[in-house]
Swiss-Prot record:
It is found in: Golgi apparatus, Golgi stack. CHCR repeats lie at residues 507-665, 915-1092. The gene is VPS8. GO terms for biological process: endosomal vesicle fusion; late endosome to vacuole transport via multivesicular body sorting pathway; protein targeting to vacuole; regulation of vacuole fusion, non-autophagic; vesicle tethering. WD repeats lie at residues 75-119, 131-170, 193-233. CDD domains: RING-H2_Vps. This is Vacuolar protein sorting-associated protein 8.
Length: 1274
């Protein structure tokens, strides 16, 4: 067989290593480096939309507002306005603009800054007569533009007719021969709102002299002008709305533009108050169309800034209050509100809102920032312009107007008009700066489906129409940009790459929509013409990288060949492979590609070309079989001196049979074609005889030199023997495909009756496993595969028990190295479907092979729990072997074992034999719990344990269980007592005794051990339980002496023991006197033992003082006939021989201290008694006062007359009587039987009812209880 070729770095090699250090063949999955790459970048997707609006516009805005808006400054206007006091408000139209002045006149200019007309606020032609000299607040124009109305800060309103012939007489004739500026007087003056702030002024309908006016008082009125008498124009008014409430104030009103519908013209009035926003229909009659409550956060704050704005077509109205905006959408057909949206709170207060067009809303904030919002997209900010640089007059909302998508600004120095520039202006600005890439990115942003600024930039809102406008300029600009980059000294890779990526994104999305725009592959080919030979490398590198990331899938044949030629000369095989795999092969130069693949041994790529170009999926398999069977001379594809790796055929077959294109790892499409290829290849691989090859010839594809030696299923056996691990890994992966389901209609016929299914392949493998001609390695791997496949696909694979015996015997009898883990996995997966007829022999085989995990499952299934437990105990690393801990396994075994059975006895023997081992591996606490649940008799095994500390810990845990004493041997209890006395500290012993119930015998046993250990405090506890209080007193006194001798001078500990001794003395009954004598005598003699300046002597002194006080207190609780008990005890103490032998001086000082303490205690007692007596006197008086207040009543009815005397249903006149008492006022006397008599027994009656029954005052008795008491009369 020929040698394999060199493994080039560029080849998509497949990792075929299967060994013990890596994956087993059951875990292996075929893959290629290319398939991994495709998985990480599967397909190109368009970049997400920029959240701040189109990227190009956002970039322009970042450079300043001048980038998006062009400004014109009109400076001559202000020189004219100076004579009239300066501007106060503005109203622009298409050909003229009107400016209100601070002296009251309204000036009309054209856009050449010529003053056209002066509107004078007077009804007379003489300007000196009754002219309003007040700043103009607002200006409005009627629908046909013939009449103008203005409101003033004084509350006056004037209307001018621009079509009248007469003018106001000038005060002086011009001397320079120039024509004087015409001046018009007002035709109507409304003074109903004088000294009131006007909050709304609009023309109503198509009328010339009808106005809707609102003011701060809350009134909204309609004024109608009409002529009377000598054609004099007068007006009348009608109130439309009056908001006059302390809780709700009118902020402003705004009339919509004229709405014409079905021969009817009308307006909608929007009204904003501090609590509501409403829409009112004014004709044919006034009616409320919509109302909503202003948000609570706004209601609860002071309204500083507010605004209302209507769109020109009346489809939307927006209003703002402080820093929140709301937009109401209205149906043009029936005026019904369609939706209402509310913005989140803005960071700063909003001065003014005005619609730029029907969709975009302009917002001016308090910091002079102008925002363009899109309310339909959650009030997204599309543009942000800084108007602070323009130095607007204050307040800016009065000097700023948006009309016909233009800005009109009154600044401190001039009048400015701003207009949005067109998209071509912005593009040209980029080009002039040499920023071609920025220009292309700007156009790309305008081609996005979501481009709300398109209309402002003079583009069509419709995406298709906008594409037609932009694609041709974009294409031409792209070519120019590419040419511009190339003309530089060195073509920059990054710039070319960025440019081409923009072109790729745009042309892929938009060029298909327009036949007039060349496709992307044409552009890329044209781009190649711009590069000189020295710069080709940069262009090819950019194109190759764009192809590699999946952005481009097709290029022209010319470019394809050029780029392949270039990288072939560079011998960059990796790029060649990526290009051929990633691009559409229809434009590929097949001859060139095949030659390169054969020259550089790009075997995977050669297979791909053969599949895609020739649509032939069988020839690669045939060639690979020729190579494996040493028939290289017959190869068509791999006919060179080098051969592909031997594992290539397994990866190729795996990909195809699982429906994936090799080596792309992408699904073969369409599905019908994929199914056909899979059927043909599966029929080929699993054919039972040699097939004809070529298929239209009479020649056959033999794997043996001698056709007579050709085996059945030749290709199956060839692949199995060539590399059994990879072949079985291939089968393991392809078995997961639905192709091999028995009920799949797409499976291929073999012969005419058999189908290539999992069952079919398993039958072939069973024959191969039984074939002794195969090596032991092949047979055991096949057996392992069969075992695992049966457990994975039980519904598709059926195998007889005899065949399973053969599988199991093959695995167990194998001597192949390195398959221990996988063999055990195979046997374990087979157990649910296999039952050995000779279980004992099977167990012996498993033991011989150390298949412990399998053996454990066998023991469980056979209920051999003793053997399972022994096996667990023999295993060193249980967690690694069984994937669980020993506690869980042991607990499981003991719970599953039937109580009282023979197996239960065997398990007990195993536990008894390995008791020490179980304690060390499971833990003492867990063992106690598990053994208690299984059998209490197991606890006796602790007696055989040599380590006493282990015994003590075990028994501690055991006897902490409630009611355990009656369930275990008494020897355990005795041992527990002995070990506790031996190993527990004195403090631990005391804690244990306090929490343990002991019998008398156990107490005596413990007492002996405690006395041996001189644990007097614990001994006192035992004596107290035995009611030997005199001995308990001795123990406590010995403990006190022991503490003093050992230097433990904690007074609180000593006093605690002494007080326990007091309690024992008092509990001693008849021995009480002797106990007290013993206690005091002991302390006196102990006092005499210590030197004068010893600390212990002082402690004894304190203890003696406490002892005498305890004795005195004990007297107070004794019987009355034992009044002399104290002196008897003291006499006996002083007569005691040990006291007599003490020094008189020591005894004198001691007794003086005792009596001083006694006197002090007596004085304290007297003071406390006095305090208690004084306090108790107050308490008694308070108690008596409470008693005199009366008693509660059990029932609400009088027991005699049955009427209500308390609670619900009481006569109402009683409340009047109560009021009379409270107010001390005279009242008409009414007999209400109000006095009530309440007895101590809680029964109540009317006083008159008792007297009617012959009871006398002060001698009342309860009629129910027949008892006399001092009743309470209320």
């Amino acid at each position: 067989m020929e040698q394999n070729g060199l493994d080039h770095d560029s080849r998509s090699s497949i990792d075929t290593t299967i060994n013990d250090t890596q994956k087993t063949f059951l875990e292996f999955r075929s893959y290629t480096q290319l398939s991994e790459k495709l998985a990480s970048s599967s397909s190109y997707t368009a970049p997400p939309l920029n959240e701040d609006g189109p990227k190009g516009v956002a970039s322009a805005v970042s450079q300043g507002s001048e980038s998006v808006v062009s400004w014109t400054t009109l400076t001559h206007v202000y020189s004219i306005l100076g004579a009239y006091g300066g501007p106060t408000c503005l109203y622009p139209t298409a050909t003229y603009f009107l400016m209100g002045t601070s002296k009251g006149c309204v000036l009309i200019f054209n856009y050449n800054e010529h003053l056209q007309t002066i509107l004078v606020p007077t009804l007379s032609e003489d300007p000196s007569i009754h002219s309003i000299r007040s700043p103009v607040k607002s200006i409005v124009i009627c629908s046909d533009g013939t009449h103008v109305a203005a409101s003033y800060e004084t509350g006056n309103i004037c209307i001018w007719n621009l079509n009248v012939g007469y003018r106001v007489k000038p005060t002086s004739e011009p001397t320079n021969g120039m024509t004087p500026t015409p001046a018009l007087p007002a035709v109507l003056h409304i003074d109903d709102h004088v000294n009131k702030e006007i909050t709304g002024l609009d023309f109503f309908g198509a009328r010339h002299t009808a106005l809707i006016v609102s003011d701060r008082t809350g009134k909204v009125s309609l004024y109608n002008g009409y002529r009377r008498g000598f054609w004099q124009l007068v007006y009348n008014s009608k109130k439309i709305l009056d908001v006059n409430s302390s809780k709700e104030k009118l902020i402003r009103s705004k009339l919509s533009p004229l709405i014409s519908r079905e021969k009817i013209s009308t307006n909608l009035l929007s009204v904003l108050t501090t609590t509501h926003f409403a829409l009112i229909l004014l004709s044919p009659h006034v009616s409320l169309m919509f109302q909503e409550t202003v948000e609570p956060s706004v209601q609860n704050s002071l309204v500083v800034n507010s605004s209302i704005s209507w769109t020109q077509n009346c489809s939307r109205v927006a209003y703002s209050v402080n820093n929140k905006i709301s937009v109401i959408s209205i149906s043009s057909s029936d005026f019904n509100v369609q939706s209402a949206s509310h913005s989140p709170e803005f960071a700063e207060s909003i001065l003014s809102i005005q619609w730029i067009d029907q969709l975009l809303l302009g917002v001016l904030t308090i910091s002079h920032q102008f925002l363009v919002l899109h309310p339909q997209h959650d009030f997204k900010i599309l543009l942000r312009l800084d108007f602070l640089i323009h130095d607007l007059m204050i307040p800016p909302n009065k000097y700023f107007v948006i009309s016909r998508r233009s800005f009109y600004l009154l600044t401190n120095y001039s009048f400015k008009i701003g207009k949005f520039v067109s998209w071509s202006d912005i593009t040209l600005r980029h080009i002039l700066k040499g920023d071609y890439l920025g220009a292309l990115e700007f156009i790309e942003s305008l081609l996005q489906p979501y481009c709300p600024l398109a209309n402002l930039l003079k583009l069509d809102n419709n995406t298709e129409e906008r594409t037609k406008q932009l694609m041709e300029p974009f294409y031409n600009l792209s070519l120019a940009a590419l040419r511009f980059l190339i003309k530089k000294d060195n073509a920059d890779y990054n710039r070319v790459y960025q440019l081409l990526m923009v072109v790729v994104r745009v042309l892929q999305q938009s060029s298909k929509k327009l036949d007039s725009i060349p496709s992307l592959d044409v552009f890329l080919e044209q781009g190649l013409e711009f590069f000189e030979l020295k710069d080709n490398a940069v262009y090819f590198e950019v194109v190759a990288n764009i192809v590699a990331q999946g952005s481009v899938t097709s290029i022209s044949p010319v470019l394809f060949r050029s780029i392949i030629d270039y990288y072939a000369k560079e011998e960059n095989l990796k790029v060649i492979e990526d290009l051929i795999i990633m691009l559409n092969p229809t434009t590929l130069d097949v001859d060139l590609a095949v030659k390169l693949c054969q020259k550089y041994n790009l075997f995977d790529l050669l297979i791909y070309i053969w599949n895609k170009i020739f649509d032939d999926y069988q020839t690669p398999v045939v060639d690979l079989i020729y190579r494996i069977s040493n028939q290289s001379e017959k190869c068509v594809i791999f006919n060179g001196p080098q051969v592909p790796p031997e594992t290539t055929i397994f990866d190729y077959v795996t990909y195809i049979l699982t429906g994936r294109q090799y080596p792309q790892n992408l699904s073969i499409s369409p599905s019908d074609k994929c199914s056909k290829i899979q059927r043909e290849l599966s029929a080929f691989i699993f054919s039972g005889f040699s097939i004809k090859w070529p298929s239209n010839s009479n020649h056959k594809l033999y794997i043996c030199e001698n056709p007579e030696e050709e085996p059945a299923f030749p290709y199956f056996h060839l692949l199995l023997k060539s590399n059994p691990s990879r072949f079985l890994a291939m089968l393991n992966e392809v078995f997961e495909a639905s192709l091999f389901n028995d009920d799949n209609d797409m499976v291929a016929s073999v012969g005419e009756a058999e189908l290539v299914s999992r069952q079919y392949v398993i039958d072939l493998l069973l024959d191969a496993m039984k074939d002794t001609g195969n090596s032991d390695n092949i047979r055991v791997l096949v057996a392992i595969f069969i075992a695992t496949s049966i457990s994975k696909y039980p519904q598709f694979i059926k195998v007889s028990n005899q065949a399973l015996d053969c599988v199991v015997n093959t695995i167990c009898s194998s001597r192949v190295q390195g398959i221990y883990e996988i063999s055990q996995i195979a046997l374990e997966s087979l157990l649910p479907y296999y039952h050995s007829r000779t279980t004992e022999n099977f167990i012996l085989e498993l033991k011989e092979k150390n298949f412990n995990k399998v053996l454990f499952h066998i023991y469980k299934s056979e209920n051999k729990y003793a053997s399972a437990l022994s096996l667990i105990l023999e295993t060193k690393d249980i967690e690694k072997e069984y994937n669980t801990d020993i506690v869980s396994i042991t607990d499981y075994i003991l719970k599953k074992c039937p109580p009282g059975s023979l197996e239960c006895g065997k398990v007990t023997e195993v536990i008894e034999t390995n008791f020490d081992l179980l304690l060390s591996r499971i833990g003492i606490e867990k063992c106690v719990t598990i053994f208690s649940d299984f059998d209490y008799n197991l606890h006796q095994e602790i007696l055989e344990v040599k380590n006493e500390e282990t015994q003590q810990k075990y028994l501690d845990k055991l006897f902490s269980t409630p009611n355990i004493n009656n369930k275990v041997d008494k020897r355990l209890r005795n041992l527990h007592i002995e070990l506790n006395c031996k190993y527990k500290s004195k403090r631990e012993m005391i804690l244990w005794l306090n929490g343990t119930v002991l019998s008398n015998a156990e107490s005596l046993q413990i007492l002996d051990l405690l006395n041996q250990d001189s644990n007097f405090e614990a001994a006192a506890i035992i004596h107290e339980r035995l009611e030997s209080f005199n001995l308990a007193v001795r123990d406590l006194l010995s403990f006190i002496e022991q503490c003093l001798n050992e230097g433990k001078t904690n007074i609180s500990t000593l006093l605690e023991s002494l007080r326990r001794a007091f309690d024992d003395c008092n509990s001693a009954g008849t021995e009480k006197k002797s106990c007290w004598i013993l206690l005091i005598t002991f302390l006196i003699t102990l006092y005499g033992k210590y030197p004068s300046h010893d600390e212990r002597k002082d402690l004894c002194n304190k203890l003696l003082q406490e002892a005498f006080l305890g004795l005195v207190r004990s007297k107070s609780s004794s019987q009355k006939d034992s009044g002399g008990e104290f002196w008897e005890i003291m006499s006996s103490v002083l007569e005691h021989q040990d006291v007599i032998l003490m020094k008189v001086q020591d005894l004198k000082q001691l007794l003086l201290n005792v009596f001083n303490t006694y006197k002090l205690e007596r004085s304290l007692s007297e003071l406390i008694q006095k305090i208690i007596e004084d306090s108790s006197q107050d308490l008694v008086q308070q108690y008596r006062k409470f008693l005199s207040e009366g008693w509660s009543i059990h029932t609400d009815d009088c027991e005699i007359c049955g009427k209500k005397i308390w609670g619900a249903g009481l006569d109402p006149l009683l409340f009047l009587a109560w009021e009379n008492v409270q107010r001390h006022q005279d009242m008409i006397s009414v007999d209400l039987k109000t006095p009530l008599v309440i007895f101590k027994c809680h029964h109540g009656f009317h006083q008159t009812c008792l007297e009617n029954l012959a009871q006398k005052p002060d001698e009342y008795s309860c009629l129910i209880c027949q008892t006399e008491s001092n009743p309470k009369i209320v």
